[in-house]
Amino acid sequence: MVRLHVKKGDESQFLFDTSVTVPVEELVKQITAIYNGRLKIDRICSEMGELAEHGITMPPNMQGLADEQIEELKLKDEWEERCVPSGGSVFKKDEIGRRNGHAPSDSMKKVLQKTMEEAKALISKKQAEANVCVTLEMVKEATDQLRGAVMIVYPMGLPPHDPIRMEFENNEDLSGTHAGQLVIEEPESQLWWAGKELQRKQKLSDYVGKNEKTRIIVKIQKRGQGAPAREPVITQEEQKKLMMHYYRRQEEFKKLEEDEDISYLNAEWADSNSLKRQFQGVKDIKWKPR
């Protein structure tokens, strides 16, 4: 299997195993699905952290309003009584007024937090450091774990306007957000290797040959952004080791130069009493008894 190290810019994303015979069209779809799936899990986990702390999201027309304003406008959250966490709730006010403040109990909160940690670990960038490939099945597994945890804590479900439910139902609205800018739609997705775009009509073997043991770095990006920066000749870690090597060598040369500067003191011509001993005929006298 060919192993691809997928990057976005200079940032490592994940490892992916495939075959040299795979059409680039199919490869782009697979890698883009995993890339966007990992982003979705990050967004869900971010919202689940808020859910664990402050409860469900209020309706859009009530978000950001003070309690007095809500009372004055006679607004009511119809979902507050329906979507009650299992085991009761603990009130923890959301200072930004986005969630209703009825947080799950500590035991249910731990269920959400533990599941978030497990899901993020499954598709983490650290998997690449551990030489573990990420698959679309792993992304789906992580999503299912998160969905299951939410169902345990909120057996009656979440409001239709809650971002977590919208993510699970693929109805999320990311327009105008930073998270939306990170997403790469499949038709706009490109893969680059060695300064070349992998054309969708070709096969991977047209670029890397037929050796199934090949390892390459590919970069994913949106169409129209030009060629991404090529990989440096040596890695950052190798560069650090090289700099340390040259530093040690430089210190060794400095020490040698210092030793050479004082080595003349041991020379015969530098001995101020040498000429005197020659005239007195006492040069090279050995005091050791025979």
From Swiss-Prot:
InterPro entries in the record: CFAP298
GO BP annotations, alphabetical order: regulation of cilium movement
Pfam families: CFAP298
Superkingdom as given in the UniProt entry: Eukaryota
Keywords associated with the record: Cell projection, Cilium, Cytoplasm, Cytoskeleton
Disruption phenotype: Morpholino knockdown of the protein results in loss of cilia-driven fluid flow along the anterior-posterior axis. Multiciliated cells show loss of coordinated cilium polarity with many cilia pointing towards the anterior instead of the posterior. The planar cell polarity (PCP) component prickle2 is uniformly distributed around the cell margin, instead of being asymmetrically localized to the posterior of the cell.
Subcellular location: Cytoplasm; Cytoplasm, Cytoskeleton, Cilium basal body
GO CC annotation: cilium; cytoplasm; cytoskeleton
Family classification: Belongs to the CFAP298 family.
Role: Plays a role in motile cilium function, possibly by acting on outer dynein arm assembly. Seems to be important for initiation rather than maintenance of cilium motility. Required for correct positioning of the cilium at the apical cell surface, suggesting an additional role in the planar cell polarity (PCP) pathway. May suppress canonical Wnt signaling activity.
Protein name: Cilia- and flagella-associated protein 298-A
Organism in which the protein naturally occurs: Xenopus laevis (African clawed frog)
